[in-house]
Amino acid sequence: MDLYPEEKTQSKQSHNSENNMQIFKSENSDGFSSDLMISNDQLKNISKTQLTLEKEKIFKMPNVLSQVMKKAFSRKNEILYCVSTKELSVDIHDATGKVYLPLITKEEINKRLSSLKPEVRKTMSMVHLGAVKILLKAQFRNGIDTPIKIALIDDRINSRRDCLLGAAKGNLAYGKFMFTVYPKFGISLNTQRLNQTLSLIHDFENKNLMNKGDKVMTITYIVGYALTNSHHSIDYQSNATIELEDVFQEIGNVQQCDFCTIQNDECNWAIDIAQNKALLGAKTQSQIGNSLQIGNSASSSNTENELARVSQNIDLLKNKLKEICGE
């Protein structure tokens, strides 16, 4: 299937409709950028586990109706694999950990989607973040002790501990430093702060090396991602969350994000199953809850004990009244 409309392309865009591939390039005094986009039709070797529910195992259906249902509920898996490359020089004033660099933006994604046919473009709803390779290169001579710290975070997450995707510490004394982060998750294209999902923060520790306005280093990064019509379209390779290139092992180290320890110590819990709940996405209204109790919770046990004590007090009071009245 040809995913791209037949129209004239700009001079800086290489378009190969036969292979369903597009290459975008841009270069000026501010830096260089290059983007590659490939359709799923060229990558048939991608395998995944289908999320399916066999209707025949639920309902007794005539053969003809079964065939019609299969056709009606079939869905084409649209996947566009993209590789984005950018290079930019960094002012030493901006290398103090006070600012962030968005590695993927809504504007960039919309530019990629605009090249697709309308019937394909309207189905795209997710972006899957596969890998980010980051190369730092000094704009000064080798041999100067220049420690640097880098962190890639999902700045949509409020917790500073949980927002970390990967962090690395190295030294530009040898001229360059490189590492790779594998986010391996998908997000909706309609998420409010998409531009903050891949935020790069860099802290150049030798802040007195140059003055404000001097370019201290070059950041070159490659982002591999996929645009799809489903959250279930992509499987990721089983890489670590962050890797340091072998040649840089002696001058740097990395810190990957932690996976939380889940403890199954809460066997008694409740869930609100009240009627007339608000529709997902609609304005919520206050309503009286109706909790379904699972197990015997501590709060439930405390309530029962309290009621028992109240009942005993009532019985004692009743007996006292009988004594006073001479009954």
UniProtKB/Swiss-Prot annotation:
Homotrimer, through the coiled-coil domain. Interacts with VAP. May interact (via N-terminus) with host prenylated Rab acceptor protein 1D (PRA1D). Its main location: host cell. The keyword Transport applies. Residues 297-327 form a coiled coil. PANTHER family: CELL-TO-CELL MOVEMENT PROTEIN. Pfam families: MP (PF01107). Keywords: Coiled coil, Host cell junction, Host-virus interaction, Transport, Viral movement protein. One of its GO terms (biological process) is transport of virus in host, cell to cell. InterPro entries: Caulimoviridae_Movement (IPR051596), Viral_movement (IPR028919). It is found in: Host cell junction, Host plasmodesma. This is Movement protein. It comes from Cauliflower mosaic virus (strain NY8153). One of its GO terms (cellular component) is host cell plasmodesma. The lineage of its organism: Viruses, Riboviria, Pararnavirae, Artverviricota, Revtraviricetes. It comes from the Viruses. Transports viral genome to neighboring plant cells directly through plasmosdesmata, without any budding. The movement protein allows efficient cell to cell propagation, by bypassing the host cell wall barrier. Acts by forming tubules structures that increase the size exclusion limit (SEL) of plasmodesmata, thereby allowing viral ribonucleocapsids to spread directly to neighboring cells. Belongs to the caulimoviridae movement protein family.
